[in-house]
A protein has these predicted regions:
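Metallo-beta-lactamase
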Residues: 1-98, 102-108
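C-terminal regulatory/interaction regions
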Residues: 99-127
Length: 127
């Protein structure tokens, strides 16, 4: 497991990356799994940052931490919370799983997820 300090909704957020053996029928020998430990932007409103005594540049720190890991070649996104995923429902994917796990492989999901969250935080900065 490779931990990466990624300040997100709190200054101490950590993201984790680890490899798993690829399932039969994939081109790779190993797949990279990634979990971002704190994508929730709810603590980055002006009032919440003041309440939590976060530094005024916490939104910038959040965006910089996303930039550090956005290009990781993640094959399988593991959301830290059900609502912090990408544009699909992980419970629905799990229900459709044929036992192979292939339904969870999405090489573009990591970048889509982080880009969407970063854009939300950038919009907060422009309010």
């Amino acid at each position: 497991i490779t931990p990466v300090h990624c300040p997100g909704h709190t200054p101490g957020t950590t993201s984790l990356f680890f490899e798993v053996p690829a399932m039969e029928g994939t081109e790779k020998e190993k797949l990279l799994c990634g979990i971002h430990g704190g994508l929730g932007e709810g603590t980055l409103t002006d009032s919440d940052m003041a309440w939590n005594d976060f530094p005024r540049n916490m939104r910038q720190i959040y965006c910089e931490s996303i930039d550090r890991v956005i290009d990781m070649p993640v094959d399988i996104v593991l959301p830290s919370h059900a609502g912090h995923g990408v544009a699909y429902d992980f419970y629905q994917l799990a229900a459709q799983n044929d036992g192979s796990g292939r339904c969870f492989v999405d090489t573009g999901a990591w970048k889509r997820m982080l880009t969407a969250r970063k854009n939300i935080v950038l919009a907060l900065s422009n309010e």
